[in-house]
Every structure is written in structure tokens, then in C-alpha cells.
């Protein structure tokens, strides 16, 4: 089918990187399609989820059925919250890692979004044939759009125009408190209160809410209702003319209309309010002839305001495909030329100046960036149909030192390459899966540390260490590894240092410390009472304590300076893995900082930088940094090998 959903920058024709896989995964069925070009969605097929052990199996079956051997980019709308890399469906037994699924299927890109977010992103591209206007009003171009989706729950969202794109709002507006507007709705509220401690709009105007209304009205009329009556049966009875069912539907539509009017006022949705989900669509003419529109406008002094806002019922058969298509197109656009990805912008700008052979490498990097990142040079050369020296020349044409440097910059430029959340390792994971999860979790934690680290505290810690008379590193258990590493680095500065992993040695040594001495205490939990008592003794004698630990712990609160390294690995029952890496990195940062201070005659950072620039050939100055492997001279490499 041709969807008519095109972005403002859409180009006619087929996608240069091949067909894109689109999916709409619900609790019962998984729907798949191919998008061959902007708005051209074909090969729509539906597969029962129960027939396939995993989502990966269902996707493979679809690709086999449509005879597609290679898909580069894919996007999935799923009826489930999506928060991080691991998705566990609440209405089906599928559970999967987004990144592991991408690797298993060989995709360059795999996006997974909530189905209601996808539905919201579909709205700007809907044609008149894919929606029915309910009542009057005229939508204002480039204005906020509202969306309600009465289905199993009551989804609420909005779209905000931003330049040439739309931003979808995340919302839990369906859980706003239900506010009855007449005596009949008062009865519904009273009945619902007997079942729920909080009666939200979702309780009464989502699909299951129709049953609540039906039973409340039956109780009013003293009618007995079978325990098996559900929303599907109520709708069928209403279509057949049953009086109680008709009143139930009318009440339901009125409540939904009142809520939609409130959403329109809240968002200022002059671009219109859309109704999605399956319930309203199944009501058909019962919905279009109901009091929905009248109740939408009935807002007292703002009735005239709402009269000008149109309301639409979404009738498109597969609206989620339109939304994930738009989201995927925006993601790929950002990657290939957006301001968020400087390396891709550089490739695009320089492409015409490259040799024909180098252009083939450039095209491979733009269209298949993960192939460049993951493959050895021999495979990259084969895929681009060039020689290996051509690959190296291409990298240097972009200002990179070589292929490794280019791979690093390319990986940094990829949007959404590394999941910024923790992925759990499960029994049965292959080495590829659990290996990638361990690496991804560590990289994710490092990136989050970079975003949240208090560098003012880092500067204070460096000043304290640089002026210390003696530095002692304390770590118990696994943290002793970090303490020993710190001792190895810092004794080279000519400062008396030692590392203790034994509590009794820590207590004995701390009792001898005083003013000018510094303890660097490394602890994952920050709660060991024995260590805290040792530090109290040293601080009372005038020593300072730098803590490398988690935030809001007793150690962090006691320390002179706390360098907080929060992460998902917080339970004391877990072996320190990620925390150990973060603590080692903090030691590296402190060591580099002290090295820079020591490169200056007076210890001041600005002068150290100036001297380093003026004396770039001075081996003695350069070696202060280079033995830490963060300098630039060849001398660093010799030390790093030891």
C-alpha cells in the first residue's frame, strides 16, 4: 500500500540502502511490512506471536516468506514500555535485548519504540482517507496535535512541531483522576470506587472501562449481569439495539469526549485531537453519532475555543507502520547528516573530493557503519571493492591517523549505538550475546559517569593530592585491586605512597597520619563500619580523605572530597565488575591531573598547559604524562608494554 506518509524532506523513489523492515508487535499478533521508498509500504503480513519462540524467529520467518536476504535498517513498534535495551513484554512471553536482536539479524539499525509513540508520529502524515472528522473545526498548520488511544489502556500523547520535524510527548495522562459531569457518571464513579482505590479516566474510558460502566448502570436498574460479560459482547449488544448496552456506549463516548476536550485545552492542540486505539473504531457509527463531540466542546467559557479544534477518528489499517517509518527516517537522517554526528557530516562533505575508490569506502561507511566498525580491514576492502591501502588512504583523507582511529570516531558518531542502560545476562545466552552485554554495560556505565561526574570535586581532589605529604590508598576486598593500581601510579610522582588492603594495617597506619597526609578510600558500598572508623581517626588528626564510592553513602558524606561513581551494580551480593572499572578510571583521571600539575614549576594548571605547548619537544616534561598512556610521545608506548 502507499501510505501517503512523507516527511517534509522526503525524496521520491526507492531507499538507496534497500528496503526497510517495519513491524507492529502486539500481545497476540506481530505485523511486518517492507518500506521500499518514502511512504511506499508493501508486503504486509500478520503472524501469530504464539507460533514463534522469539521475536527473532518471527522476523526471520517473515524475511524468508518475502524472499529478502538482507535488510539494513528496521524499526519496531511494540505494545510495551521501552526503557533501555532489554524489553520484556507484559502481554506476551517474548523477552529480548534490542542490541542482541540487531546483531542476530545482521541489521545496521534496529529501533524499538512504544506503539503509542509510533502512532503519535504517524499523525502528520495521515491522509483524508485514513481519518474521519467528528464534528466541526479546522486544524491549524504547524500546531500542536493531541492524541488519545482507548484500547486495553488509555494512551495520551501529543506532537509538538519543531522546525521540519515533530517531537512526541511521553505521557501517562490516562491516569488523571476521573471527574464525572452528571448524575449518571456519578453512579459510575461510585461503582468504580468499590473496585479501585483511585479511579482514573483509564478505568472508565479504556476498553475494560466499558464493562465497569455497563455493570454500574445495570446495578442502578437492578439488573443481573453475567460474570462473563466483556467489552466485546457489550459492543455487539449495542449494535444489536440492546438498550443497556446502547446507554453504556453513549456514556463511554461522553466521558471520552470530555477527557479529549481537557487534553486539547492542556496541550493547546490547535492542530486537532486524534482518537486511535481499537475501541472507538469498532463502535463505528455508534461513536460518530454519540455525544463525544458535544462533550468535547462543553467547557463553559472555552466552548468557542474548542469549537474551532477538529477531532478525528483514525481509520488507517496499520497506522503504527506510518509512525515507525517516520521515526526511522529521522534517525537515519540524523546519522547521515545531522549536527549530532560530526563524523558522518565530514564524510558527506568530503565525498565528492575523494577518488572513485575512496568514495566506495565512504558509501560503505554511510550506509553500513557497523560493518566498518566491526569488520577487519580485509572484509572492509572486499565489501567496498577496493584494496586495503585504499581503505587506509580514505581514513587519512578524513584526518584520521588510520583505520583504528576512524573506527573510534565512527562509533562515537553513531546515534544510539550503545544502550545507555543495563542489559541483563541470561542463562542460555551465547558468547556473542553475553560478551556484547558485558562490554555494552561497561561502556554505558563509563558514558554515564562522564555525563554526571562532578569535575569541580575532581579538581579539588587533584589539588589535595598534588600538595600531599603522604598518600595512602585503602581498599577492602576487590577494591584493594584499585588501591594497588593507584599506588603503582602515584609513587612515580615522588610522593611517599602505599596501598593497604588489610583492615588492621589500615588502622595501624591511619593512627600515624596527620596534617598534610591524604587517604584515598575506595569502596563500592561506602558502608563498611570498620573502614569508616579508621577514616574518622585519621581525619581527627588532620588528614584528608578522598572517597571513590557511590553517592549518599556514609563514606561519601564523611570524606573531604567525594568522587561519586553511581551505576546499576549496587547490590552488595554482586561481585564488583563495572564498579571496579569505574574506580580504576577515577584513579587514572586523578593521576593524569596530578601529572599535569607536576609538569608546571608552580603547580598551576594554566601555566602547565602553556609550558607543555612551549616545550613540546622536552622529553622530561612529556614523559610526566606519557608514562600514563594519555600523552602523545612514543616514550609512552615503551612503558605501557611493561
From Swiss-Prot:
Transmembrane domains' residue ranges: 576-596
Region ranges (Glucokinase): 1-340
Residue ranges occupied by any HTH rpiR-type domain in the UniProt entry: 341-417
Binding site for ATP: 23-28
EC number per UniProt: 2.7.1.2
DNA-binding region: 377-396
Keywords, sorted A to Z: ATP-binding, DNA-binding, Glycolysis, Kinase, Membrane, Multifunctional enzyme, Nucleotide-binding, Transcription, Transcription regulation, Transferase, Transmembrane, Transmembrane helix
Pfam families found in the cross-reference section: Glucokinase, HTH_6, SIS
Membrane-protein topology: Single-pass membrane protein
Domain annotation SIS: ranges: 461-600
Region (Putative HTH-type transcriptional regulator): 341-642
Stored PROSITE patterns: HTH_LACI_1 (PS00356), HTH_RPIR (PS51071), SIS (PS51464)
Molecular function per GO: ATP binding; D-glucose binding; DNA binding; DNA-binding transcription factor activity; glucokinase activity
InterPro entries noted in UniProt: ATPase_NBD, Bacterial_glucokinase, Glucokinase, Homeodomain-like_sf, HTH_RpiR, RpiR-like_SIS, SIS_dom, SIS_dom_sf
Catalytic activity: D-glucose + ATP = D-glucose 6-phosphate + ADP + H(+)
GO CC annotations, alphabetized: cytosol; membrane
PANTHER family documented for this protein: GLUCOKINASE
Family to which the UniProt record says this protein belongs: In the N-terminal section; belongs to the bacterial glucokinase family.
Protein name: Bifunctional protein glk
Taxon lineage: Bacteria, Pseudomonadati, Pseudomonadota, Betaproteobacteria, Burkholderiales
Amino acid at each position: 500500500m502507499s501510505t501517503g506518509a512523507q516527511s517534509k524532506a522526503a525524496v521520491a523513489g526507492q531507499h538507496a540502502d534497500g528496503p526497510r523492515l517495519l513491524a507492529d508487535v502486539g500481545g497476540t499478533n506481530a505485523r511486518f511490512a517492507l518500506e521500499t521508498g518514502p511512504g511506499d509500504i508493501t508486503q504486509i503480513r500478520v503472524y501469530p506471536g504464539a507460533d514463534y519462540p522469539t521475536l527473532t524467529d518471527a522476523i526471520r520467518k517473515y524475511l524468508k516468506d518475502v524472499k529478502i536476504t538482507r535488510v539494513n535498517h528496521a524499526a519496531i513498534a511494540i505494545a510495551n514500555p521501552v526503557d533501555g535495551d532489554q524489553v520484556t513484554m507484559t502481554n506476551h512471553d517474548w523477552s529480548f535485548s534490542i542490541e542482541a536482536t540487531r546483531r542476530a539479524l545482521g541489521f545496521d539499525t534496529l529501533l524499538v519504540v512504544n506503539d503509542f509513540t509510533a502512532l503519535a508520529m504517524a499523525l502528520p502524515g495521515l491522509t483524508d482517507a485514513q481519518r474521519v472528522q467528528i464534528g466541526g473545526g479546522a486544524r491549524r498548520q504547524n500546531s500542536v496535535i493531541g492524541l488519545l488511544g482507548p484500547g486495553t489502556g488509555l494512551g495520551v500523547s501529543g506532537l509538538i512541531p519543531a522546525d521540519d520535524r515533530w517531537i512526541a510527548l511521553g505521557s501517562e495522562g490516562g491516569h488523571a483522576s476521573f471527574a464525572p459531569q452528571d448524575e449518571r457518571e456519578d453512579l459510575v464513579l461510585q461503582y468504580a470506587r468499590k473496585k479501585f482505590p483511585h479511579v482514573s479516566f483509564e478505568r472508565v474510558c479504556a476498553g475494560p472501562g466499558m464493562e465497569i460502566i455497563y455493570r454500574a448502570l445495570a446495578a442502578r436498574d437492578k439488573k443481573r449481569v453475567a460474570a462473563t460479560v466483556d467489552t466485546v459482547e457489550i459492543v455487539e449488544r449495542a449494535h444489536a439495539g440492546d438498550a443497556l448496552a446502547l446507554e453504556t456506549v453513549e456514556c463511554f463516548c461522553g466521558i471520552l469526549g470530555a477527557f479529549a476536550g481537557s487534553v486539547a485545552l492542556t496541550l493547546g492542540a490547535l492542530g486537532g485531537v486524534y482518537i486511535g486505539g481499537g475501541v472507538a473504531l469498532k463502535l463505528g457509527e455508534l461513536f460518530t453519532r454519540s455525544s463525544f463531540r458535544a462533550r468535547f466542546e462543553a467547557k463553559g467559557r472555552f466552548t468557542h475555543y474548542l469549537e474551532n479544534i477538529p477531532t478525528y477518528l483514525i481509520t488507517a489499517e496499520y497506522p503504527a507502520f506510518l509512525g515507525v517509518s517516520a521515526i526511522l527516517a529521522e534517525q537515519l537522517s540524523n546519522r547521515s547528516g545531522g549536527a549530532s554526528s560530526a563524523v558522518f557530516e565530514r564524510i558527506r562533505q568530503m565525498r565528492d573530493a575523494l577518488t572513485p575508490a575512496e568514495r566506495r569506502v565512504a558509501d560503505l561507511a554511510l550506509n553500513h557503519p557497523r560493518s566498518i566498525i566491526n569488520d577487519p580491514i580485509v572484509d572492509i576492502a572486499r565489501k567496498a571493492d577496493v584494496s586495503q591501502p585504499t581503505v587506509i588512504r580514505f581514513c587519512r583523507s578524513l584526518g584520521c591517523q588510520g583505520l583504528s582511529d576512524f573506527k573510534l570516531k565512527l562509533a562515537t558518531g553513531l546515534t544510539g549505538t550503545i544502550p545507555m542502560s543495563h542489559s541483563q545476562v541470561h542463562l542460555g545466552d551465547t558468547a556473542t550475546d553475553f560478551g556484547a552485554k558485558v562490554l555494552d554495560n561497561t561502556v554505558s556505565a563509563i558514558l554515564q559517569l562522564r555525563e554526571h561526574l562532578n569535575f569541580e570535586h575532581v579538581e579539588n581532589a587533584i589539588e589535595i593530592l598534588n600538595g600531599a605529604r603522604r598518600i595512602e590508598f585503602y581498599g577492602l576486598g576487590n577494591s584493594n585491586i584499585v588501591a594497588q593500581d593507584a599506588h603503582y601510579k602515584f609513587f612515580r610522582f615522588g610522593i611517599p605512597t602505599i596501598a593497604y588492603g588489610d583492615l588492621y594495617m589500615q588502622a595501624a597506619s591511619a593512627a600515624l597520619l596527620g596534617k598534610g597526609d591524604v587517604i584515598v578510600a575506595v569502596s563500592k558500598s561506602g558502608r563498611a563500619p570498620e573502614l569508616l572508623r579508621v577514616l574518622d581517626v585519621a581525619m581527627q588528626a588532620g588528614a584528608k580523605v578522598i572517597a571513590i564510592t557511590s553517592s549518599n553513602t556514609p563514606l561519601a558524606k564523611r570524606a573531604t572530597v567525594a568522587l561519586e561513581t553511581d551505576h546499576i551494580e549496587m547490590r552488595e551480593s554482586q561481585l564488583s565488575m563495572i564498579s571496579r572499572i569505574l574506580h580504576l578510571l577515577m584513579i587514572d583521571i586523578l593521576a593524569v591531573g596530578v601529572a599535569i600539575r607536576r609538569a608546571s614549576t608552580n603547580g598551576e594548571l594554566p601555566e602547565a598547559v602553556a609550558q607543555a605547548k612551549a616545550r613540546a619537544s622536552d622529553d622530561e616534561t612529556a614523559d610526566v604524562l606519557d608514562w600514563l598512556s594519555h600523552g602523545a610521545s612514543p616514550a609512552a608506548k615503551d612503558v605501557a608494554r611493561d
